[in-house]
Amino acid sequence: PAYNVPEEGRVVVNITVNPAGVVIGTSINPQTNTVNSTLRKAAEDAAKKARFNTVEGPNNQTGTITYYFNLR
């Protein structure tokens, strides 16, 4: 994800995905190692844009996405 702060870190985002493959919920996982709100928001925004394969059935799926922010 794009970000404009001179910091590095790992942001782990919990996601809930509906059967259509759309992310319908996000939250920051405790395994995140940065308190920087800009990095956290960038990761959550990117997770909300993610799309997954559709699945049969009415149940939502849960999981995590890990984003690594590195300075270059």
Q: Which residues does each predicted region cover?
A:
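A short, well-structured alpha-helical segment
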Residues: 6-7, 12, 22-60
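Short, low-complexity, Pro/Ser/Thr/Gly-rich segments in the mature regions of secreted, periplasmic
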Residues: 64-71
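Short, ordered coil/turn segments that flank beta-strands lining enzyme active or ligand-binding pockets
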Residues: 19
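Short, basic/aromatic recognition patches
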Residues: 1-4
